[in-house]
Regions:
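Short, acidic/small-residue loops that bind anionic groups at enzyme active sites
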Residues: 1-8
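Long, compositionally biased stretches enriched for glycine and/or charged residues
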Residues: 10-282
Length: 282
């Protein structure tokens, strides 16, 4: 079972904007891949309130749920209404590539790439964590991203250990439960959790066809990248990068593959032969 922090943030957002009471039962039909999920229905005490939620987000009256490490841009009304789905904030990287790249480049010139910013934040955090008297959540943690991971993880553990039979949104191998996804794929979706693990929700047996193209593209990249990590072969890395929708040129893919493999040599023992060949070519 894989845990993601995005759904719990979306759930908190829904409870807030629909002004639900603690006693209200909230059930969400959520599907997709890790960090790439869509909501297709929201049930409050057994009745759907999805149309109300979607209309509020699409019209801009309700501010969509986001996370600290992603810039807060609204999806267009046309996109939301044409999909009739509520996308998570990570979908901005696919539906607003041009805008997100411009923002990221601006951030890079101001203070470095996101990874460099995270390294600085983590260094500060680990210094603070050395203090055994620390009993508050450091403000620096808000700059890190990954909000609510601890909540999500503890709730999943609680549901399994205590056989809660509770609704959670996790990554699982679906074993054929979804009829239009290969049976051996891992997916992120609404599940019921208890002592036997995660069971896919019976309401979700088919992923919405409108976004299946994107889901297949991203999963194809994930599989190719996993194969490359195992093989240590340059051509496998090249294939994965060329399949990514965020890489727009085969030439860029090759330059990126060479540069990143050499830059991270000490972390890539499986690529020793590949790295030796790349150095020889230089």
């Amino acid at each position: 079972i894989g845990v993601c922090n995005i759904p719990i943030g979306m759930k908190m957002f829904i409870r807030d904007v629909l002004m639900l009471k603690d006693s209200d039962d909230l059930s969400i039909d959520l599907f997709g891949l890790n960090h790439m999920v869509f909501i297709k229905d929201v049930l409050v005490n057994g009745k759907s309130r999805f149309a109300e939620l979607l209309d509020g987000v699409a019209s801009g009256q309700l501010k969509a749920s986001g996370v600290k490490n992603i810039f807060d841009l609204p999806f267009s009304e046309g996109l939301i209404r044409s999909m009739n789905l509520l996308p998570c904030s990570y979908l901005l990287y696919y539906f607003k590539q041009k805008e997100m790249l411009a923002i990221e480049m601006g951030e890079y010139y101001k203070g470095g790439a996101r990874a460099q910013v995270v390294q600085k934040v983590e260094k500060q955090l680990f210094e603070l964590y050395k203090n055994p008297e620390l009993n508050v959540k450091p403000k620096e943690l808000e700059q890190r991203g990954g909000a609510y991971y601890s909540d999500a993880a503890c709730e999943v553990i609680n549901a399994i250990y205590n056989d809660k039979q509770a609704e959670h949104y996790v990554n699982i191998p679906h074993h054929g439960h979804i009829d239009n996804i290969p049976a051996d794929w891992a997916v992120e979706m609404t599940c019921t959790l208890g002592r036997d693990g995660a069971t896919p929700h019976p309401r979700i047996t088919h992923f919405d066809d409108k976004v299946m193209g994107l889901i297949h593209t991203i999963k194809g990249f994930e599989i190719a990248a996993s194969n490359a990590a195992l093989s240590g072969e340059f051509n496998d890395v090249l294939l994965a990068l060329n399949l990514s929708p965020l890489v727009h040129s085969d030439r860029d893919a090759e330059l990126l593959a060479r540069e990143m493999i050499l830059a991270h040599e000490k972390w890539l023992p499986n690529f020793a032969d590949c790295i030796a060949e790349l150095k020889k070519a230089h």
